[in-house]
């Protein structure tokens, strides 16, 4: 598979913006036309706990110290296209893209703020899943111990170092890992968004040389 570049994402997002503008114009003139927007939810509106399978939940918790990384990967990068709501196309600048379901397209946001939102919401989901599986006796004692240690570490504000890199705290270290994870998965996320657009009956408007299989 050839790499999907940022130009392709901008092409896709422009189609979403055009659709949104067209929908608003028709509503304002009382000409109601059904516009099929991608079924993507804004950050924080995902019902992750009810969406993930028991197997996915178990797999996430079995990742132990990398459970939050695995959570973000499964939720935002894998098969749950409804949650393809954040895209990082550059590691160096301060910006990232987030989907705004009220607008119907992706908007630019502060990368650090978006990553903090993702981490906050997914940590809430992680703790909920941990409680759910723990109550159901689906977690072994070793995993329970390591997950508890991980959760405590995430709340620890002491500086954390990994290799030669110093971080303000462990949460900042994990946030950096998630940033790289999302960046490395930008091609799949972009392609899956393109497929959602196709499901919305507007795939023919995307130049054929922009979606590469």
Sequence positions of predicted segments:
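Extended amphipathic coiled-coil helices
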Residues: 1-3, 8-213
């Amino acid at each position: 598979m050839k790499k999907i570049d940022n130009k392709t994402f901008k092409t896709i997002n422009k189609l979403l913006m055009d659709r949104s503008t067209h929908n608003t114009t028709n509503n304002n003139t009382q000409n109601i036309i059904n516009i099929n927007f991608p079924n993507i939810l804004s950050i924080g509106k995902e019902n992750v706990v009810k969406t993930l399978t028991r197997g996915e939940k178990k797999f996430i918790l079995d990742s132990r110290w990398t459970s939050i990384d695995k959570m973000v990967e499964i939720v935002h990068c894998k098969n749950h296209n409804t949650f393809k709501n954040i895209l990082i196309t550059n590691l160096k600048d301060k910006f990232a893209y987030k989907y705004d379901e009220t607008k119907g397209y992706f908007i630019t946001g502060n990368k650090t703020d978006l990553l903090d939102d993702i981490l906050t919401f997914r940590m809430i989901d992680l703790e909920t899943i941990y409680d759910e599986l723990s109550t159901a006796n689906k977690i072994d004692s070793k995993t329970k111990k390591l997950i508890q240690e991980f959760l405590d570490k995430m709340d620890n504000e002491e500086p954390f170092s990994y290799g030669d890199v110093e971080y303000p705290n462990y949460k900042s270290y994990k946030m950096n890992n998630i940033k790289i994870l999302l960046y490395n998965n930008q091609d799949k996320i972009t392609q899956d968004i393109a497929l959602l657009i196709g499901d919305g009956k507007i795939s023919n408007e995307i130049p054929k040389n922009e979606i590469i299989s």
